[in-house]
From Swiss-Prot:
The keyword Cytoplasm applies. Its main location: cytoplasm. It comes from Prochlorococcus marinus (strain MIT 9312). GO terms for molecular function: ribosome binding; translation initiation factor activity. This is Translation initiation factor IF-3.
Length: 190
């Protein structure tokens, strides 16, 4: 018995679109390229109409009774569909969770750097996980870490809103911030 191959080297089976001769339904509801109904006609007559106009007969909906076909230029239609899909992919931004780590005994300049990082992440539309980690007996000062995280949330309140308040998780205290959808309106002091 020959050994079984480790990988399937065959190319994947591509689903071919139902156009022209690949349409197997005997009766079709046909719509022309302008959107005008041509009525329910048999398949051969619909193919003849499409070839006279030098266009393709494309199956639009096979769930309908009878199935709906459209007379159109399939190459142009396929190009436009790919273009729309590409635009949609370009516009959709995958939200990531970026992390900003620090200790509760952080220096002023280091804190400002973390605020700058968090601001950059929030402006690019990502969520921010603020983590304060403890070493050894520092865990006894979790109240100082919570104060630090709340101060950070307060400093970033123009760009963000608290998604999850500070809470302890093992040897860390974490807080999640998400980008603010609407700009914060500051109240006038006076």
């Amino acid at each position: 018995m020959p050994p079984r191959p480790r990988f399937d080297r065959r190319s994947p089976v591509r689903e071919l679109p139902n156009i022209n001769e690949r349409i197997k339904y005997p009766q079709l509801r046909v719509v022309d390229s302008d959107g005008k109904q041509l009525g329910v006609i048999d398949r051969l007559e619909a193919l003849e109409i499409a070839s006279q106009r030098e266009l393709d007969l494309v199956l639009v909906s096979e769930k309908a009774n009878p199935p709906v076909c459209r007379v159109m230029d399939y190459g142009k239609y396929k190009f436009e569909q790919e273009k729309k899909a590409k635009e949609a992919r370009k516009k959709s931004h995958q939200t990531e969770v970026k992390e900003v780590k620090m200790r509760y005994k952080i220096d002023k300049h280091d804190y400002d750097v973390r605020i700058g990082q968090a601001t950059k992440f929030l402006k690019s539309g990502d969520k921010v996980k603020c983590t304060v980690f403890f070493r050894g007996r520092e865990i006894q000062h979790s109240n100082l870490a919570e104060t630090l995280l709340l101060k950070m949330a307060n400093d970033l309140e123009e760009q963000s809103e608290i998604q999850q308040k500070p809470k302890r998780e093992g040897r860390n205290m974490i807080m999640f911030l998400s980008p603010r959808k609407t700009p914060l309106i500051k109240k006038d002091e006076g």
